[in-house]
Amino acid sequence: MGVIINESKSVKWEGKVEIADNFIKRAFGFMLRNPGHALIFILPFETRFNATIHGFFMLKSIDVIFLDSEKTVVDVTTLRPWRIYVPKKAAKYVIEGPVGLRKVLKVEVGDKVEWIT
């Protein structure tokens, strides 16, 4: 179990939190898996290109939160299967989770987000 915290609004989401900190975990993400937990991608560089995500082979839509190196939200979206999304600004961290994650966290651009695994 883990927790994702919107420190700007003092709200949290509790559930399984997995860190995708290597190429294989980042490459597969939620492909062919049910997004019932949160997956946090730690990217090697803070760029828009590295933070681009896709929904290829995904079974369901997911909520996605993009954070810069200071863990400040720079973009938020809901990604549908078979779509590609490029964040509006460079990101160092990407949080993927079930649809509703962004609503529970009340997350908006500019919020500070932290997690505990």
Swiss-Prot record:
This is UPF0127 protein PYRAB11210. It comes from Pyrococcus abyssi (strain GE5 / Orsay). Belongs to the UPF0127 family. Disulfide bonds: none annotated. InterPro entries: DUF192, Saro_0823-like_sf, UPF0127.
